[in-house]
């Protein structure tokens, strides 16, 4: 579905053109309709959205920020997996990462696997636009329904 949408920075003008944004969670709706601008101004994160061009509806929105992975704070199996890819001479105590601070799918598009497509778009790719080693998703609730793994194209 996202391939048929326009990718753009979330701005006041976009929200006005699209007649706003709503999702199942009031706090996240408030973030993407009001608070996102303060986060961008304070350099805490940048918000983006996908807009359906034929209807001018915001399909989904997300906020990303620069972060890092502190290797010593990882469980040994993850630490080994991360370090295994890096030559000894270039290993560091922390590595750059992307933090997904907010992520939401519009109520209008809920149940269409848009969240999966969005995570595939954001996730690091070996030769893609994001050169970081890791992506963090800050779960809103204490219960995370499943672990995200990028889907293979064509599968």
Please identify what each model-predicted range represents.
Residues 35-38, 121-129:
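A generic secondary-structure signal
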Residues 43-62, 77:
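Conserved beta-hairpin
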Residues 111-124:
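Conserved acetyl-CoA-binding loop-helix of GNAT-fold acetyltransferases
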Residues 131-133, 139-155:
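Conserved active-site alpha-helix within GNAT-family acetyltransferase domains
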Residues 1-42, 47:
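Short amphipathic alpha-helix that is part of the acyltransferase structural core
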Residues 45-49, 61, 97, 102, ...:
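Short hydrophobic/aromatic beta-strand element in the GNAT-like acyltransferase core
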Residues 101-111:
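A short, internal acetyl-CoA/4′-phosphopantetheine-binding micro-motif in the GNAT/acyltransferase core
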Residues 63-102:
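Conserved acyl-donor/pantetheine-binding loop and adjacent beta-alpha core of acyl/acetyltransferases
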């Amino acid at each position: 579905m996202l391939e048929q949408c326009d990718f753009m920075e979330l701005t006041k003008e976009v929200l006005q053109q699209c007649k706003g944004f709503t999702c199942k969670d009031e706090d996240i709706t408030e973030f993407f309709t009001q608070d996102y601008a303060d986060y961008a101004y304070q350099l805490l994160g940048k918000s983006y959205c996908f807009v359906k061009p034929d209807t001018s509806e915001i399909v989904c929105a997300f906020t990303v920020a620069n972060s890092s992975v502190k290797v010593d704070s990882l469980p040994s199996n993850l630490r080994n997996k991360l370090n295994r890819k890096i030559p000894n001479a270039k290993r560091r105590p922390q590595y750059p990462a992307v933090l997904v601070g907010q992520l939401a799918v519009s109520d209008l598009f809920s149940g269409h696997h848009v969240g999966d497509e969005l995570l595939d778009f954001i996730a690091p790719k070996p030769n893609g636009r994001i050169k970081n080693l890791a992506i963090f998703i800050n779960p809103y609730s204490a219960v995370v329904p499943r672990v995200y793994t990028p889907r293979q194209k064509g599968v």
